[in-house]
């Protein structure tokens, strides 16, 4: 069975992130490798400092915050790890941009994929749902750097239907081309619910990889 690399910013395994990929395309074997597999837990900075702080999980389920720059070389190791195991391509299961990350085989990054899709549609004004206030500033700059005019909304943690109405109230009198869900690890039904109620195109960085995999044949 052909293999696809599933690149994680935390520790492997992450069945909650990989099972949706298996459901999207069961004709591949998914080889997981996590950035934090390559460091001792004691070496993970207790107080991360940097422009882009990301949240992930350790193997035991604990949540940690890590800086994009700390993760970058570790992700390169994770890519090399899955490529040694014969993958045909790799997918990054994280909404962080990680510009410059690469391997010998094709690597698909959600932020880059979403940017390409929106530019192909001529979109510029976008609303972006940030997972928390900590990441809001970095997420805002990420989309500005890619040529968009973002409106950043920090997810208040409401159920999907209530969240949709909250977003609608936040965007009153404002027109946007897309709503971007800028995080991963949530139920795939979230985007569908928001799209139906808001009546705007929703691009979900947690779902975009699975959507792509449905169109790949071994």
Provide a role label for each language-model segment:
Residues 66-111, 177-191:
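N-terminal glycine-rich phosphate/adenylate-binding segment common to multiple enzyme folds
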Residues 82, 143, 170-173, 194:
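Generic structural signal for hydrophobic
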Residues 38, 123, 158-159, 202-218:
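Short, flexible loop segments at boundaries between secondary-structure elements
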Residues 14-15, 98-101, 114-116, 136-137, ...:
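Short, well-ordered alpha-helical microsegments
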Residues 1-66, 130-162:
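N-terminal glycine-rich anion-binding loop in soluble enzyme alpha/beta folds
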Residues 88, 162-166, 177-198, 205, ...:
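Hydrophobic alpha-helical
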Residues 73, 158-169:
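Structural motif
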Residues 91-97, 102-136, 141-145, 149, ...:
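Conserved mixed alpha/beta catalytic, RNA-binding, or beta-rich assembly cores of soluble enzyme
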């Amino acid at each position: 069975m052909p293999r696809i690399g599933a690149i994680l910013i935390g520790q492997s395994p992450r069945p909650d992130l990989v099972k949706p990929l298996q459901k999207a395309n069961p004709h591949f074997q998914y080889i997981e490798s996590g950035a934090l597999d390559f460091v001792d837990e004691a070496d993970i900075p207790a107080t991360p400092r940097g422009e882009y702080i990301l949240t992930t999980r350790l193997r035991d389920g604990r949540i940690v915050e890590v800086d994009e720059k700390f993760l970058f070389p570790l992700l390169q190791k994770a890519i090399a790890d899955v490529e040694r195991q014969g993958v045909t391509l790799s997918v990054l299961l994280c909404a962080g941009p990680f510009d410059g990350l690469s391997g010998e085989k094709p690597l698909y990054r959600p932020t880059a994929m979403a940017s390409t899709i929106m530019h192909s549609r001529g979109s510029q004004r976008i609303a972006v749902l940030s997972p928390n206030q900590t990441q809001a500033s970095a997420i805002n700059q990420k989309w500005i750097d890619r040529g968009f005019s973002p409106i950043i909304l920090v997810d208040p943690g409401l159920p999907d239907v209530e969240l949709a109405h909250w977003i609608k109230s936040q965007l009153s009198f404002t027109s946007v081309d897309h709503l971007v869900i800028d995080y991963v690890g949530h139920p795939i039904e979230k985007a569908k619910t928001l799209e139906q109620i808001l009546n705007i195109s929703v691009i979900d960085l947690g779902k975009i990889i699975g959507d792509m995999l449905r169109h790949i044949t071994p």
